[in-house]
Amino acid sequence: MGASVVAGIIACSGGASASSGPSVHGGGMVTLPAQFDDLAGDPVYFQLQAHGVGEAAAGRFNVVHLDDAGGLYAHAVGDVTCLSVVGGVASATGIIRHAWFRDFPGSSVVGMAVAITVADNGSEDALGFHFEFFGEPTIAPCADVTPFVAVDRGNFAVRSG
């Protein structure tokens, strides 16, 4: 399952949206930085497709976390519930609709919130993310997260309108 999901995310190159108005589309891989302790160095693949303004936004997100050996560590899919776009930065919040975590069998994060922010910097995109589970703080509707990690592979396209 992991390889096909990852291939689909990387193939998504951030092409233009068919809808008008604010949007973010694309996919890419980040490498978890040192602040993630034992998970540092793991690749995480993000796909984000959203359009609209505020809580009238619609879209989907897909996150795949692989371990350092390339095995599937976690996978989450959900719906975007809010989108804010300012210049080349898009902040989306969403709700997890399906998830699987290797180290937490039986735990349910379905219904919990996610915040993802993308800075579209051409070939040097950056990403920030926060997941509302495993002791992390609650995510407010339409929250944003400072992009803190470079996108190593892939591309996101942010459109302000």
How would you describe each model-predicted region?
Residues E124-G161:
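C-terminal partner/receptor-binding element of secreted or periplasmic proteins
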Residues W100-P105, V110, G122-G128, P137-I139:
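Glycine-anchored, exposed beta-strand/edge motif detector
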Residues P22-L39:
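A domain-level signal for the mature, folded cores of soluble proteins
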Residues M1-A7:
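Sec-dependent N-terminal signal peptides
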Residues F36-A115:
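Predominantly extracellular/secreted and cell-surface proteins with exposed
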